């Protein structure tokens, strides 16, 4: 029994002292953060009006110095992903192209709260969201070398 205790003590001692501590380099936390806005566009290759939605989304992104991020959620075509229809259902998408701006709820003409909105509203609500204060931030340090990326 004493030998087992000695073996356990030696094993735990080796494991404990052989670990190398990794020192994380975390810079100072900034006093303020840059507000970013996410626009998620419901679209499809089959949709005749969707190129206009893509054009409006691109204009909104370009007009806001990289503070608006656009994502196209395809439905009913070869670029669709499994969760697009789920998101459309949860956020009450009623047409194409339409989209969500930071997934905020806004009132429609009848006073109903909707998250998915017409492409004509994206710019207005993106500017409104950009005017709000960002209470937290996210920093990602990345490096790309050839075909490898480190995050």
Annotate each language-model stretch with its function.
Residues 38-41, 69-74, 97-102:
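Structural recognition of the beta-strand scaffold that forms the well-ordered cores
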Residues 19-29, 124-151:
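Non-globular targeting/processing and membrane-anchoring segments
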Residues 28-68:
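Local sequence-structure signature of Cys/Sec-based thiol-disulfide redox active-site neighborhoods
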Residues 2, 15-38:
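Bacterial Sec-dependent N-terminal signal peptides
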Residues 7-16:
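Bacterial N-terminal signal peptides
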Residues 65-84:
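Thiol-based oxidoreductase modules, predominantly thioredoxin-like and allied folds used
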Residues 44-49, 56, 75-80, 103-108, ...:
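Solvent-exposed loop/turn segments at secondary-structure junctions
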Residues 93-135:
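Non-catalytic, surface beta->alpha helical segment in thiol-disulfide oxidoreductase systems
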């Amino acid at each position: 029994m004493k030998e087992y205790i000695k073996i356990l003590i030696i094993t735990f001692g080796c494991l404990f002292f052989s670990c190398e501590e990794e020192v994380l380099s975390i810079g100072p936390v900034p006093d303020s953060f840059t507000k970013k806005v996410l626009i998620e566009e419901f679209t499809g290759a089959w949709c005749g009006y969707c190129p206009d939605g893509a054009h409006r989304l691109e204009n909104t992104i370009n007009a806001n110095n990289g503070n608006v991020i656009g994502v196209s959620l395809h439905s009913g075509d070869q670029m669709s992903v499994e969760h697009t229809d789920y998101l459309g259902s949860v956020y009450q998408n009623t047409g194409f192209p339409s989209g969500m701006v930071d997934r905020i709820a806004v009132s429609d003409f009848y006073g109903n709260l909707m998250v998915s909105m017409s492409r004509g509203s994206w710019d207005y609500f993106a500017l409104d969201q950009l005017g709000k204060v960002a209470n937290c931030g996210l920093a990602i340090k990345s490096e790309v070398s050839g075909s490898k990326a480190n995050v």
